[in-house]
Amino acid sequence: YRSAEEYISEHKSMGKIQCLFKTPKKDFVTIKKGRVCLHPWAFISADDKLLFQESNCYNTKPEDHWVFKTLKLPQAKHLKGKALFLSFRRNYWHSLTDDSSLLNLLEATSIDLESFDHIICERPDNVASQQLQEIWNINQNKLVSLTENKHLECEELSFLAGSLSLAYTPILQTREKILSKIKNIQEKPSKRLIASREDATTRRWLNQSECVELLTGRFNFECILPSERNLFEQAEIFNQAEVVVGIHGAALSNILFMRAKTTVIELRYRGQEGNFSSASCYEELSKLVGINHITVLCNGEERPELRGRSIEDANILVDKTELLKIVESCL
């Protein structure tokens, strides 16, 4: 089927679709005897057919989907009752934007998380992710890992579908919920931050130490490692920033907490682009928050060993002279 909508229109007794947000369109899909598979990524209907639009990652034609190149899917684990698919990623960006937005939309339409017997979502592996789940009172006893189980068949499966674009209202609701828990927020942002990814294994900033030395010495920047801080500490320090410099990656998710008319300088590999790239996600978030967003395209080294992620997760080499000029123009 081209989409869940097409499937349900042909099999009305097998599911329903509820519009949660009109622009960008966000639909809440519920299907009976639905399946979700991790490798290859796929939502599958009760009659054993792919729901292409909801399962599409890297292909423009249904017949090119990886599910049709797979000899056998992993054995499915059966879940009785109602299951909500939230996420299969342990990824700060997706938790803060996609997952939190869905939870806000469900809350706004009075869909109670407690009405689900299972929540398909990974258990937190860091304090920030744990705090996010606590904000929405996610019952840890209901969590089911798709990463561990690979393939789940649900008596009733619900999930979000529609546009991948960020939705203004639920995004800002997440921002306000988190910032409201922080005491003594400064009136005027004053910090100049460099968001480091030195603990990451992909998308590394190859000459970070040289750039940090220049920015801290000339412009009084402070280099931080956001992953070492909890959710509220990350939100607070980004809320205090007038300028943030950082490589494209999870740490920049915290620009959600910055104030309007502040500045983000995103460092990105120049080859990162295309229909199935996340290249513009931080620019989109900055636009919603009202931030001045400057993207610096950099040379770098691709990672062939990462296969489909070789360009998306390439390491970068920043032109120091160009960076200094851009930073100076922002101060």
Question: What is each model feature region?
Answer:
Residues 1-331:
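The feature primarily captures lumenal catalytic ectodomains
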